[in-house]
UniProtKB/Swiss-Prot annotation:
Gene that specifies this protein: Troap
Residue numbers carrying Phosphoserine: 16, 97, 169, 306, 324, 338
Signal peptide bounds: none
Superkingdom of origin: Eukaryota
UniProt-recorded name of the protein: Tastin
Record field: compositional bias (Basic and acidic residues): 227-246, 269-282
Region (Disordered): 1-102, 154-177, 189-285, 364-392, 462-502
A GO cellular component entry from the record: cytoplasm
Phosphoprotein found in the keyword field: yes
Functional description taken from the UniProt entry: Could be involved with bystin and trophinin in a cell adhesion molecule complex that mediates an initial attachment of the blastocyst to uterine epithelial cells at the time of the embryo implantation.
Entry-linked InterPro entries: Tastin
Complex and partners: Directly binds bystin, and indirectly trophinin.
Compositional bias annotation for Polar residues: 27-37, 55-64, 158-168
Originating species: Mus musculus (Mouse)
GO terms of biological process kind: cell adhesion
Amino acid sequence: MTTLQTNKDPHLRGVSPNPSKIPVLSQRCQDFSSVKSRSLDQENQDPRTPAQKPPRSTQRQRPLTDTAGLRSKTLHQTEKSPSLKTLRNPLEELKPSSGGSNVGLVTHPQTEAIGAIEFVADPAALATILSGEGVKSCPQGYRSSLAQRVLVRERKGGTTQRGQSARSSAYLAPRIPTHQVGPARASCFSRLEGPGLRDHTLSPPRLEALNPPPGSSHSSTRPSLQELRRETCGGGRDGDCTDRRTSASQASRLLLKTPVQPASLPLRGEQEAVPHSDDGGGRHHLGLAQRIPLKESLTNTRSTYSSMKRFAIRRKAQFTPLRSLPKVQQAQWLSGLSPHSSPEEPALPWRQIAMKLFDQESRITLQKEPRKPSVASTSGPRPKRTPSHQELRIQRINILQQLLQQEVEGLAMGDGAPLNGGSAFDMTELKLPTAEISRTLTASEHNSGAALVGLSQHSGATEPLLSEECEEPQAYPEETKAAQPCSTTELKPPVPHRAEPELPEPCLPALSGPPLPSCRGQAEPPMACPRTEPGASAACALEAGTPESSTQPCCNQGPPATASLTFSSQSPVCASPSIHSLYPTGYSGPSSLAPRTLALRQRLRACLDTIHSFQEAHLDDECAFYTSRAPPPGPTRVFTNPVVTTLEWQDALRFVPIGPVVPQDSPS
């Protein structure tokens, strides 16, 4: 029946906008409910099919609940109340008028419905809504603000009298998205566009609390107030539209005052309003609410998204710092060679670790090899080995170079009796070797460089060379005598020296043998070591016995170890006896300088021998390679072209040092 009446009403709707203007004010409460149902029906149904308007009353009664269930209830109610239907007709008129005019309560509805000019005010109302004033306006399409908005679009449709139908169609369009949104989620697409935030909208109770001044809403505030009224009327299932109008106006004011509150507003009103806006039954409500909240939601959404962005940014900032902190810590750990390795930056840390490990190994070797020399050479720095490997290397190299230069100068100044044929070395030879040694030291800083430094500092390193060169164990006993002044570190190295002969690379084991603390403890200057620790003589004597075997094997191993330059160069250095000889310089030389010069000569000789042996081994390898390689090219070629053969020989025997004999044969 209501449907039939609503069908009959269309002419009233179209014609009644004028009379509905005034009645809207007086009847809005009653019409409000009826209009709710109508607007709901219209929104739910095509505006052109007003027969379905009975749901209007249904939605009108329970706009906040599920539109489907509410519709059934409202259908029953619509059947029960034909008066509501009659009211609905004027309400419909008022509704179009209210939709058409911002002054839904005033007589403008006709003009608004007739002309879209008055709807221009609606844009302002919509703007206010967007600003957040009436954003909350519940999805009650019956409200004049909603109707106005709808009418504006309706105007766009180009229908004035049928604006309601157009409105309902417009509502339908928006309500489709609204339907997509859960009714419980978005009460009127509450100001907060976000689905989670939509629920936080003004609640009818709050609006009612704001109600006290009835009729407080008018043209300027109507859009928002009407929306609020919709919320209040929709939220409250009572038909008191006036109270809710006032509450809506107040709510709109509150919204204007606090546009951001919706998120914090109680969810009850939102939920109630949600059914109107979200319910399929309250689709027209939803459409209206959607439009308004959608527009308003833009601002709300902005704020919401901004907050979301803030959260995201904060999260990123928090997590990123956490990650970065571990990275830094890991980098620090890596710098400290801690077991922890940075997963994000493995390459650099591992490289550094590898470098450090090698450095540490070199240190250990150097400490153990030149433990004694290191004591003298890095007397200050040794205890500080913690400093940096590079610094220690540089210091050692510098000290070694200085010592070598001083010793060479001393040799030039005073011809010290050459130990073990030390005279064989001319000063020029010494100078050249010193330059070579300095170069080699610079080349291999931590390996041979540090060892040479220790040896030069302790001058004992020369003794192993001397013993190797002269193969005179007596020199070691002498060294032991002189070694008595040597530091206990010398004593410790002797043991490693003993071990050295056993190991193919005795230097490394010997180095490992001497404890670092002893070296550090013996960090005293080379001169101080002999002075401070005369008790080392026993160890030196032991070394004297072992040095022969140890130093000789070191030297022997050095040349054979030519495959690895560092080892060959280190082996002479490794020989701890050389260290002993350094401080026992007094025994060998007529003067303190003489023993040093002799030790230096011995060291230089050993170093040079090792270097030469290494080079020779390489040359031998190259010669063997080239020689073995030369024969195949001839047989492979069927025709022996003299030019080709010569070229092949040149290519194969291009090695100049080896070539002189073979190239002569090869051209032939």
